[in-house]
């Protein structure tokens, strides 16, 4: 009996909808329970070894096979993942005369003004990661690699390259070239911003000093809480998107005690039910997070409902991340800052935005090269040294090897972010060339984006979006233009 691809797609969509609804209800503070395991149990037949094999034999699109394979690996390792989450939630750190939850340490680190106390907290985090979490993370990694081989691929890299259509090795060469090309400008662009935000340059800088650098509280005054949501709705409305009556989109601003403090997007039914969840606080970081998630929201809300599930929910996530970056980077765009927030001299924010983005890009470029070694099918023993060396050299800070397993994006999602930065740069260039520096205030730019959004995530992925936007090659070297 031939494999019923339509039935599989229908159940896959039901699963994705159920999981995103669970995510929305829990993290918006409406439900204490997070019953994700029950969702997996209801749809367990989607993720069997046989389902993955049948999809391959039926010649199903890569993103649909990718969905089945990732789900199969996740299902087979769910006990390890659950134990890891339980152990992490139970861990506490003795710091500053008190016991604090392990998961709260990152936030405390970002807001701690004393660099020595930050370093003590970071050292305690690394020690617990090494002793309590890494043994489980190593077991999880080894199990994932074994399941990958059992499915017929020699390595996780080979699996991801075949199913995503992304040449990860070539992207690794491009990002290594980016590291080399930006090496001489890195300290010049970043050090002044480090001194402004954390009071020190690269001499004496530790990893624990980077969270407050990314927090950048000195810039918060220009980003008031009362303008957070209006600045977004006004931007969208000038592009011809009437948010108040937009079909399928709910902007959830209701205060709830257990609501996530960070904005997020839940595409429950694409494009008919998409939630943008906000807890308006204000500050530069809050604006950036909201606009990032708004980019996802508008993309999902405008996707053609007739597209198959793999092109509405799955496909090349470089695409939706590019739209998210496009909106996020408005919060460091001088024309937008003047127009929407009335900032007369936006240059300090622009300079900080350029520096922080370069740190992120070099970090992910260094991480990709390491992850190619980690998931390339070879022996992983000793790779913590490679991880520490690549990150230390890229960021000019002594990076701890203890994070070599915790700081890994599943299924090379780091590559999606890297490609998204390149695609966003191309899109921004196309928008400014067609509609001017204030493209975000032009209805024609809104129509241009809605046309792109309607195509979903595929089937040609980021390359297809770039072709529709005006052509060119999705080459990571385009990011060099950001450096002036």
Ranges and model annotations:
Residues 20, 26-31, 42-58, 155-158, ...:
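C-terminal, non-catalytic "cap/extension" segments appended to globular domains
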Residues 175-185, 303, 314-352:
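Post-HExxH zinc-binding segment in Zn-dependent metallohydrolases
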Residues 81, 123-275, 281-284, 467, ...:
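Contiguous, non-catalytic segments that form substrate-binding/exosite surfaces or channel walls
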Residues 1-131:
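N-terminal helix-rich structural modules
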Residues 99-114, 143-156, 205, 392-393, ...:
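Core structural elements
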Residues 309-323, 356-359, 409-419:
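Active-site metal-coordination segments of metallo-dependent hydrolases
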Residues 282-304, 321-325:
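Active-site recognition of the HExxH zinc-binding catalytic motif
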Residues 203-209, 261-273, 294-304, 339-346, ...:
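Active-site-adjacent bridging/hinge elements
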């Amino acid at each position: 009996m031939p494999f019923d691809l339509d039935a599989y797609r229908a159940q896959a969509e039901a699963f994705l909808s159920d999981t995103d609804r669970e995510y929305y209800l829990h993290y918006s503070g409406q439900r204490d329970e997070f019953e994700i395991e029950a969702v997996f149990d209801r749809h367990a037949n989607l993720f069997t070894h046989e389902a993955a094999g049948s999809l391959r034999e039926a010649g199903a699109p890569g993103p649909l096979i990718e969905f089945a394979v990732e789900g199969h690996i996740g299902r087979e390792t769910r006990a390890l993942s659950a134990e890891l989450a339980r152990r992490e939630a139970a861990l506490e750190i003795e710091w500053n005369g008190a016991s604090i939850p392990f998961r709260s340490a990152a936030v405390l680190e970002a807001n701690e003004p004393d660099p020595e106390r930050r370093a003590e907290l970071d050292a305690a985090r690394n020690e617990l990661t090494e002793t309590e979490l890494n043994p489980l993370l190593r077991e999880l990694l080894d199990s994932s690699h074994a399941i990958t081989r059992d499915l017929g691929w020699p390595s996780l890299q080979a699996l991801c390259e075949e199913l995503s259509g992304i040449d990860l090795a070539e992207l690794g060469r491009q990002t290594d070239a980016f590291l080399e090309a930006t090496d001489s400008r890195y300290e010049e662009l970043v050090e002044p911003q480090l001194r402004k935000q954390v009071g020190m340059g690269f001499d004496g800088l530790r990893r624990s000093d980077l969270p407050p650098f990314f927090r950048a509280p000195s810039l918060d005054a220009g980003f008031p809480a009362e303008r957070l949501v209006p600045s977004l709705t006004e931007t969208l409305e000038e592009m011809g998107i009437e948010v108040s009556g937009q079909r399928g989109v709910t902007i959830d601003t209701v205060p709830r005690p257990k609501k996530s403090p960070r904005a997020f997007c839940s595409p429950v039914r694409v494009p008919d039910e998409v939630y943008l969840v906000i807890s308006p606080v204000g500050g530069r970081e809050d604006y950036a997070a909201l606009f990032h998630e708004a980019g996802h929201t508008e993309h999902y809300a405008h996707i053609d409902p007739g597209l198959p599930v793999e092109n509405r929910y799955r496909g090349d996530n470089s695409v939706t991340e590019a739209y998210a970056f496009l909106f996020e980077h408005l919060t460091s765009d001088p024309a937008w800052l003047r127009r929407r927030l009335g900032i007369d001299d936006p240059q300090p924010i622009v300079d900080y935005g350029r520096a922080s983005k370069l740190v992120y890009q070099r970090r992910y470029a260094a991480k990709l090269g390491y992850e190619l070694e980690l998931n390339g099918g070879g022996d992983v023993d000793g790779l913590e040294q490679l991880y520490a060396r690549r990150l230390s050299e890229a960021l000019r800070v002594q990076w701890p090897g203890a994070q070599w397993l915790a700081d890994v994006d599943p299924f090379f999602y780091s590559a999606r972010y890297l490609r998204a930065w390149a695609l966003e740069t191309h899109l921004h260039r196309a928008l400014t060339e067609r509609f001017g520096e204030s493209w975000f205030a032009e209805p024609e730019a809104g129509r241009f984006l809605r046309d792109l959004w309607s195509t979903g995530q595929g089937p040609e992925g980021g390359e297809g979006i770039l072709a529709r936007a005006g052509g060119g090659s999705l080459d990571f070297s385009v990011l060099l233009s950001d450096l002036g």
